[in-house]
Amino acid sequence: MDHFAYRSRSLYCENIPVAQLAERYGTPLYIYSKATLVHHLHQIQEAFKEVEPLICYSVKTNGNVALCKVMAEHGSGFDVTSGGELHRALPVSYTHLTLPTIYSV
């Protein structure tokens, strides 16, 4: 499932014209679809539910705190490899998870 689509030669993200977002926030601009992110996380969780996995989001991949918050809200733990990554993941972990789960090697 992808919540990005072209309509009448304009790109939309979750029914919002991307051009409108660029006009409001300027460019370059990173745009994420919360619905797409959550959908894919739930697919992974469902596929492995028999073994009760802890899916951990790699903060190194994208340390955006808003993305970390979405992942925590939907049951994700965090994979961190530095103090900075831990600093971003810990506050959302304590807020949204029953037991904060931070994994680091």
What does each model-found stretch correspond to?
Residues 1-97:
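A charged N-terminal "starter" segment
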